[in-house]
Amino acid sequence: MNPILINRLQRKLGYTFQQYELLLQALTHRSASSKHNERLEFLGDSILSFVIANALYDRFPKVDEGDMSRMRATLVRGNTLAEIAREFELGECLRLGPGELKSGGFRRESILADTVEALIGGIFLDSDILNIERLILNWYQTRLDEISPGDKQKDPKTRLQEFLQGRHLPLPTYLVVQVRGEAHDQEFTIHCQVSGFSESVIGTGSSRRKAEQAAAEQALKKLELE
């Protein structure tokens, strides 16, 4: 690994690993080594959910669990994590196998998001829960300050459906047009057809559901421009 890139990443994270092997493992995709980051990702996913849930509980004492769940989902979903990964310039530090490198895996949102969760798991094991909580809240400070309960926290498919129903238009249709990758690391491409659109909008994701949500998000953006 390029030490300049690793040092830059740790500065952006706000944390220097004591156990360097944990950092390397967190950055290692399944395609690159048998000692990959998926166990750390599993751990980091749970820690992130706890930290964000706790922060929302403290910030919104009068908001019900439904709105808090939707706000948490917005904050921990894949594209939000991928945005954070890009803020860290994480793609340049990933350890990928030749196939993933060739297909542009360092830009793929699902890989970037999973690696952020793996880093959370790695930092927790390298330090403690208070330290990783402090870091997560720092990474999320602006997003936590800006988020609020309400309809905009509903997932894109729900918002698109309600938008169309409110105008007495047909519901959108979703079609899987491509599935790439091996069973453990697939990427789905979905076409979403909306009444009034001359062409389908496209969404991609690591599962059919995520790809459909991404396509619905693109449809909503297009509707807002019309």
UniProtKB/Swiss-Prot annotation:
Where, subcellularly, is it found? Cytoplasm
Keyword flag Magnesium: yes
Query: What family is reported?
Result: Belongs to the ribonuclease III family.
**Active-site positions on this chain:** 45, 117
Catalysed reactions, as listed in the record: Endonucleolytic cleavage to 5'-phosphomonoester
What the protein does comes down to:
Digests double-stranded RNA. Involved in the processing of primary rRNA transcript to yield the immediate precursors to the large and small rRNAs (23S and 16S). Processes some mRNAs, and tRNAs when they are encoded in the rRNA operon. Processes pre-crRNA and tracrRNA of type II CRISPR loci if present in the organism.
Q: Which organism is it from?
A: Pectobacterium atrosepticum (strain SCRI 1043 / ATCC BAA-672) (Erwinia carotovora subsp. atroseptica)
Q: Cofactor(s) for this protein?
A: Mg(2+)
Subunit comment: Homodimer.
What are the residue boundaries of the DRBM domain, all occurrences included? 155-225
Q: Which UniProt keywords apply?
A: Cytoplasm, Endonuclease, Hydrolase, Magnesium, Metal-binding, mRNA processing, Nuclease, RNA-binding, rRNA processing, rRNA-binding, tRNA processing
Q: What one GO molecular function would you report for this record?
A: rRNA binding
Question: What is the protein name stated in its UniProt record?
Answer: Ribonuclease 3
